[in-house]
């Protein structure tokens, strides 16, 4: 007789295992599931575990040639989401053997590659991943990390200041370099290529790199401080990207940047390796993130993209702001900011952190706050993000009625005033506006 019956089989018979005790080497995932009407939560959770690991819709002859029990993903817990009808958090454990070492690309292909189009689900969102040290140790992570970057730049005890050069498209290389110089001379630490500045007809990358390097060295000589500009090395091929990074290194600039989602994790990890080997810092921009993380009930939360980036490698990552948003969002933002820069982060559901994450000794990433912030936000930003952050003001620098350099001066003065006030024990939340007003005299 035949060894098994043909036909469609319930996933939960194999993949829903509430009695399973997770191993410390397992990769754990928390999924927010919205099953189709009539699909039980256990079946939906089991389906997610199956389709993102060893399963298919039926038993196959070749299942007999391997040990499913050793390799299968397991849905080990399901809890309803408070305040939502028909939404559940499904917890899935994956054996470490399912993943290629040192490949964020493979990890994401396995966990979120296929299952999100699954018919039995109306929507699915990966809320969090627990990366065990046994896996994270196969990655080198950020090229340098927060501490090494501070040492390279010789800047301590305060957040760093940046500015994206606007108008982001249309300036010639010479004028672009001039704008960079004005900002850095005024007191910023960094300026930045916009994420869509690559190598367009109005400004080819090589010309931009040259004029920006000139601006860096001139402003460095005048201020006696180390200056940087995130030169965007993102390109259409990995070879071209590395060629741009090599040229940046030959010019002697301190930092390059990459759009890690549009460029892809494979390209990003290659660039991070190059930067580590050649002493370049790496700024990461998250262009395209909202396509993935904007919907509450479908996609991937940004904290998952942030963890993936820390493994793939970057020294800065743009992480949005918290100013003027809702309180709850502030806690969640701080949750993934800590996941980026701390060694050990406790599970805390109020901050959106579903698992305790131990990064062991993997270097941290500077979160970059940018997007619609200006000098009056400085007290709040200093208080919320603390010292290990980069505060990036685009329009908040270049929009100064007297020009870029005075705009940069205003930001630097405000930052120094806030840091000093905090160190003297003043309450930034209460006295913030007063502190800025005093400083502006």
Curated annotation (Swiss-Prot):
State the needed cofactors, names only. Answer: Mg(2+)
Q: Which GO terms describe its cellular component?
A: chloroplast
Q: Which leading EC class covers this enzyme?
A: lyase
Q: What is this enzyme's catalytic activity, as reactions?
A: 2 (2R)-3-phosphoglycerate + 2 H(+) = D-ribulose 1,5-bisphosphate + CO2 + H2O; D-ribulose 1,5-bisphosphate + O2 = 2-phosphoglycolate + (2R)-3-phosphoglycerate + 2 H(+)
Q: Where does Mg(2+) bind?
A: 192, 194-195
Kindly list the positions at which N6-carboxylysine occurs in this protein.
192
Cite the post-translational modification comment.
Answer: The disulfide bond which can form in the large chain dimeric partners within the hexadecamer appears to be associated with oxidative stress and protein turnover.
Query: Where does it live in the cell?
Result: Plastid, Chloroplast
- Tell me one Pfam family matched here: RuBisCO_large
> So what family is this one in?
Belongs to the RuBisCO large chain family. Type I subfamily.
What's in the misc comment field? The basic functional RuBisCO is composed of a large chain homodimer in a 'head-to-tail' conformation. In form I RuBisCO this homodimer is arranged in a barrel-like tetramer with the small subunits forming a tetrameric 'cap' on each end of the 'barrel'.
Q: Which NCBIfam families match?
A: PRK04208.1 (NF003252)
Q: What is this protein called?
A: Ribulose bisphosphate carboxylase large chain
Which species is the source of this protein? Myriopteris lanosa
């Amino acid at each position: 007789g035949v060894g098994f019956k043909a036909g469609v089989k319930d996933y939960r018979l194999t993949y829903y295992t509430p009695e399973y005790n997770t191993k410390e080497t397992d990769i754990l995932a928390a999924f927010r599931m919205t099953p189709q009407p009539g699909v039980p939560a256990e079946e939906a959770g089991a389906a997610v575990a199956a389709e993102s690991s060893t399963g298919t819709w039926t038993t196959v002859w070749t299942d007999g040639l391997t040990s499913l029990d050793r390799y299968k993903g397991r849905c080990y817990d399901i809890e309803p989401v408070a305040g939502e009808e028909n939404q559940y958090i499904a917890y899935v454990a994956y054996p470490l053997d399912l993943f290629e070492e040192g490949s964020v690309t493979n990890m994401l292909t396995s966990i979120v590659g296929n299952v999100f189009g699954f018919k039995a689900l109306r929507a699915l969102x990966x809320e969090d991943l627990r990366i065990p040290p046994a896996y994270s140790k196969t990655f080198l992570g950020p090229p340098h990390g927060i501490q090494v970057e501070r040492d390279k730049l010789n800047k301590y005890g305060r957040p760093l200041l940046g500015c994206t050069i606007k108008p982001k498209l249309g300036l010639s290389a010479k004028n672009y370099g001039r704008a960079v110089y004005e900002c850095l001379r005024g007191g910023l630490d960094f300026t930045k290529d916009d994420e869509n500045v690559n190598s367009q007809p109005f400004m080819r990358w090589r010309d931009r790199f040259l004029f920006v390097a000139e601006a860096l060295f001139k402003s460095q000589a005048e201020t006696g401080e180390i200056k940087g500009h995130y030169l965007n090395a993102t390109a259409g091929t990995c070879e071209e990207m590395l060629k741009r990074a090599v040229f940046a290194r030959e010019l002697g600039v301190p930092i390059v940047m990459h759009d890690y989602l549009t460029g892809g994790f494979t390209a990003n990890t290659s660039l991070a390796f190059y930067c580590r080997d050649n002493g370049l810092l790496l700024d990461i921009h998250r262009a395209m993130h909202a396509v993935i993380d904007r919907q509450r009930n479908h996609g991937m939360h940004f904290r998952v993209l942030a963890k993936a980036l820390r493994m793939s490698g970057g020294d800065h990552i743009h992480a949005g702001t918290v100013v003027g948003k809702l309180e709850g969002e502030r806690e969640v933002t701080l949750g993934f900011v800590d996941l980026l820069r701390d060694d050990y982060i406790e599970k805390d559901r109020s901050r959106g952190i579903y698992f305790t994450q131990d990064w062991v000794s993997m270097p941290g990433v500077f979160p970059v706050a940018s997007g619609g912030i200006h000098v009056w936000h400085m007290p709040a930003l200093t208080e919320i993000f603390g010292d290990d952050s980069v505060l990036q003001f685009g329009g908040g620098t270049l929009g100064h009625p007297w020009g870029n350099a005075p705009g940069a001066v205003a930001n630097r003065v405000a930052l120094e005033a806030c840091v000093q006030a905090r160190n003297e024990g003043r309450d930034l939340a209460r006295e913030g506006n007063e502190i800025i007003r005093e400083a502006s005299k």
